């Protein structure tokens, strides 16, 4: 998303003061006192935040994490989307997971947010990011008895790759709003979503993509009402939450374009041929698949993923790609129920 469009959305938010809000269920029980016991944690003196040194083929780098809560039976690591987005937009978890007594970790992957940004495309491979996640797991004390991953969008892709390599070190997996195939994702956009769009706007969007004008303000001005507000976060841009705007404004655009491609309506970068659907049957840990009715991810395909997984479970929401915002009641009720069940 362009800085111009983000500033416009931010200004509209300030003027209207009408950010969408959904309050957590006040009837939920408070977590036990032990949830707030920070003794023994290396981040106890810093509000849960710290940096972890990871090793790469290009030398050591530091990545930022922040722990919330204390629950030895369940450590949930959050993998953000993009690629290139920071942890900021998943701060919505702070409104729900503490009351459920879930220990979880915000995390900026290398090249994003508060983590190091070496700006080195040689480090932008799935295998290296899988290794990075494994180093973070070890640093937070994650084991097969307590470690769970929640990956959203690109983070869901990364979570699937991690599970295929290291499910012996996992307790559970949450695939949030990510299909197991980029070719299938592209087909859904081209054959289902694009025909439903305003065709005059679509023609302009495709023309700008073909001529390499995706960084111009007009591109996002067309995409915001015709794509983002329909499929990404189903609220007017003036109501988009501040954490979402902050994550987008701080996005590593070069990383995103290299992996995803310049188009917002399909992938053409390094991930273009990624497909793991056939391998899902080998993931035997409990897995929740979250699917939004209006998402850019095909709901029927997401349902098939849940069936392909031996212990898969589908959570169908009435939201878009960020249904943790635009259908919070369903998203968090299903997520928390799943985590409590595997805990």
What are these language model-derived features?
Residues 38-62:
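N-terminal cap/lid segment of alpha/beta-hydrolase-fold proteins
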Residues 61-117:
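Conserved HGGG/HGGXW glycine-rich cap/lid loop of the alpha/beta-hydrolase fold
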Residues 109-150, 154:
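Active-site loop/oxyanion-hole signature of alpha/beta-hydrolase fold enzymes
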Residues 145-188:
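Conserved hydrolase catalytic core segment
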Residues 173-214:
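Flexible "cap/lid" loop of the alpha/beta hydrolase fold
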Residues 203-281, 285:
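Alpha/beta-hydrolase
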Residues 277-319:
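Conserved loop-alpha-helix segment in the C-terminal half of the alpha/beta-hydrolase fold
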Residues 311-343:
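Catalytic active-site module of serine/aspartate enzymes centered on a nucleophile-bearing elbow/loop
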């Amino acid at each position: 998303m362009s800085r111009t469009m983000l500033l416009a959305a931010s200004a509209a938010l300030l003027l209207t003061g009408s950010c969408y809000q959904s309050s957590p269920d006040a009837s939920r029980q408070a977590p036990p006192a032990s949830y707030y016991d920070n003794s023994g944690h290396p981040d106890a003196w810093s509000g849960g935040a710290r940096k972890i040194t990871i090793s790469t083929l290009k030398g050591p780098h530091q990545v930022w994490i922040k722990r919330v809560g204390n629950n030895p039976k369940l450590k949930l690591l959050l993998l953000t989307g993009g690629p290139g987005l920071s942890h900021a937009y998943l701060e919505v978890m702070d409104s729900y997971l503490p009351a459920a007594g879930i220990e979880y970790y915000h995390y900026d992957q290398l090249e994003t947010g508060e983590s190091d940004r070496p700006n080195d495309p040689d480090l932008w491979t799935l295998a290296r990011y899988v290794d990075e996640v494994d180093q973070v797991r070890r640093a937070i004390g994650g084991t097969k008895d307590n470690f769970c991953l929640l990956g959203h969008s690109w983070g869901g892709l990364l979570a699937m790759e991690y599970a295929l390599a290291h499910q012996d070190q996992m307790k559970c997996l949450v695939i949030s709003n990510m299909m197991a195939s980029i070719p299938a994702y592209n087909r859904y956009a081209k054959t289902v979503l694009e025909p439903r769009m305003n065709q005059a706007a679509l023609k302009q969007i495709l023309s700008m993509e073909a001529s390499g004008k995706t960084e111009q303000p007009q591109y996002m001005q067309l995409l915001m009402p015709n794509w983002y507000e329909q499929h990404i976060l189903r609220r007017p841009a003036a109501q988009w939450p501040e954490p979402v705007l902050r994550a987008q404004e701080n996005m590593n655009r070069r990383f995103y374009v290299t992996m995803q491609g310049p188009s917002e309506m399909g992938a053409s970068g390094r991930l273009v041929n990624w497909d793991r659907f056939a391998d899902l049957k080998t993931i035997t840990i409990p897995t929740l698949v979250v699917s939004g009715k209006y998402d850019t991810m095909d709901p029927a395909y997401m349902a098939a993923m849940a069936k392909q997984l031996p212990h898969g479970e589908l959570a169908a929401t009435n939201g878009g790609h960020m249904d943790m915002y635009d259908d919070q009641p369903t998203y968090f009720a299903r997520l928390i129920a799943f985590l409590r069940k595997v805990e």
